[in-house]
Design a protein with these regions (language model features):
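PRPP-associated nucleotide enzymes
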Residues: 1-82
Length: 82
């Protein structure tokens, strides 16, 4: 496990039975409350995509918008909201 993965595991909250019984919701709000960790997430995505040709980044709903736009800027490609 690398440092970023450890930091994410420590930050992401597990909320059992939300929004209904039997669902384990993973709340990433604590990640977004830590600017350096959020930046590390975007940089980690960017690093993982260095060898993949990318035409655009599509962000799906609210959380996808929050991380998709900075990633698109880092990669120098358009951002598409879905």
């Amino acid at each position: 496990m690398n440092d970023l993965e450890t930091r994410l595991r420590n930050a992401i909250r597990a909320v059992p039975d939300f929004p209904k019984p039997g669902i384990l919701f993973r709340d990433i709000t604590p990640v977004m409350e830590q600017p350096l960790l959020s930046l590390a997430v975007v940089e980690g995505f960017r690093d993982a995509m260095q060898t993949i040709p990318v035409d655009a980044i599509a962000g799906i709903e609210s959380r996808g918008f929050l991380y998709g736009m900075p990633l698109a800027l880092r990669l120098g490609v358009p951002f598409i909201t879905v």
